[in-house]
Amino acid sequence: MKKIISIIALVLLQISCYAVIIETTANLNVYYPEYTKIDLVCGQMPKAAQKDVEFCCEAAFTGELLNEFKHSNIADNHICNGEMKKGYRCKANTGGFVWGKGKWKFMRKADYPTEANGWNIGFCQLLIIKDGIVRAIGSKMKNNRNIYRALCEKDGKLCIIESKKVMTYEFFVKCLNTYKVTHALYLDMGRGWNYAWYREKGGKVKEIFPESKLAPSYKYRTNWITFYK
């Protein structure tokens, strides 16, 4: 009996040790996954039945609305499970992110690696903030209104930050800067693309924008940044 109780206690401890911690500001929801591994999952979104997944959401842009998955339909070269995959060239991307063995880098696209070189995940996107400095915002984009999401570093921790409501891109960037993130990289959004989910302490799954599963574009999603416990 003592052995059974010990096993149950250990399982409960393991569950409680990993969860997504949420902070909020007046305009932002901030998700801090407690993780041991990050990967770019391609082709099919991780399922809630995968108990080791803590958080997953869309990452890189998808090119065309195809009925079959192709790595070449993901914007720019990307690293999945330690392997570099060839994507299509995307001029809109200005930065990138890589992670491996507990270390990560946000970078300009010009510095994005040509080979995996030990990185477990990598993808390119629009670089919003680098080393605490806001990057130039294009005049065509600054007044675009949407709910936005970004992969960020804040006080030495990785987090996913999302606007609480529809706002201009320029204001979203201002909110990130006010929150004092060190780095920020855009994540793909829009109806269908914005669906995400995370795991609360205790293992319960919480969906973000579950209504997007009904959007026509939902089935065309291609890649997800995924945090594992």
Q: Which role does the model predict for each range below?
A:
Residues 17-229:
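Gly/Ser/Thr/Pro-rich low-complexity, intrinsically disordered segments
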Residues 4-13:
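Sec-dependent N-terminal signal peptides
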